[in-house]
Regions:
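Membrane-interface helix-loop junctions and terminal tails of multi-pass membrane proteins
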Residues: 1-255
Length: 255
């Protein structure tokens, strides 16, 4: 979620800024490809960290979905109230987000974990085009890998209709309401992140603010849209439908 300890610039820092300036001044296909290759050579650790970050987030999402909502779960049977379970899930995912943001890897990569956030910083000129492309690709790949791992870990439990790989789906009020709700919560999150991370007094708390919002959104807004705000996270949960044979094989426990 950018460099949570200082500014909205990604923690790729000065060499990234130089790459951005060079790319902007000579935006030919060949120069862009050269910048992409150079970025891959210099910043591949950060790309892997972004992939691992969203992968771990998806593992956490699938795990807590199984624990809280699977019909055979002791927790679900002990806590029949869906709002209470959703609140517990929100707290769990908020803490997951905070942990990832303030982890050593999160501090180094900037913990974007979300293509929307990466593209926002790209639009603001705070991340180079080649790095933005690689971050987004890594986030999608990491999210899918996290869901695949969850399928192997939980087997058929993660395919239950109450879990569905922790998919974020529109609620009973329809797609229009879900779209509007996602727009509102995304706007609020970005407003908080940009303002807090640009404040010398609040910058170090930006990750906490983001985690608290995630917890509140899951608790209160999830019935409307499923609470995603993250296209890579949504794609990861829906990808089993696109790669059914692959996920079918990984979701079967060894005999």
């Amino acid at each position: 979620m950018t460099d949570m300890q200082s500014t909205t610039k990604s923690s790729l820092t000065e060499d990234q800024a130089h790459t951005y300036e060079a790319t902007s001044s000579a935006a030919t296909p060949r120069s862009w490809l050269h910048s992409l290759i150079a970025a891959q050579t210099q910043h591949w650790p950060e790309y892997l960290m972004e992939a691992a970050g969203l992968g771990l987030f998806m593992i956490s999402a699938c795990t807590f979905a199984v624990i809280l909502d699977h019909p055979a779960s002791f927790v679900r049977n002990a806590i029949p109230n869906s709002f209470v379970r959703r609140t517990l899930g929100g707290i769990a995912m908020g803490l997951t987000a905070i942990g990832l943001i303030y982890s050593p890897w999160g501090k180094r990569s900037g913990a974007h974990l979300n293509p929307s956030l990466t593209l926002t910083f790209f639009r603001l000129g705070k991340i180079a085009p080649a790095d933005a492309f690689s971050y987004v690709f890594s986030q999608f790949a990491g999210g899918v890998a996290g869901v695949m791992f969850s399928a192997a870990l939980w087997g058929g439990a993660v395919t239950d209709q109450n879990i569905r790989y922790a998919a974020t789906l529109p609620g009973l009020r329809g797609v229009g309401v879900a779209f509007a709700a996602e727009a509102v919560i995304s706007f609020l999150l970005m407003t908080v992140v940009l303002n807090a991370s640009n404040s010398a007094r609040l910058a170090s708390l930006t990750g906490v603010f983001a985690g608290v919002l995630v917890a509140l959104y899951i608790s209160l807004e999830a019935p409307l849209s499923g609470m995603s705000m993250n296209p890579a996270r949504t794609f990861a949960s829906l990808s089993p439908g696109k790669f059914g044979m692959l996920f079918g094989s990984t979701s079967q426990r060894p005999l």
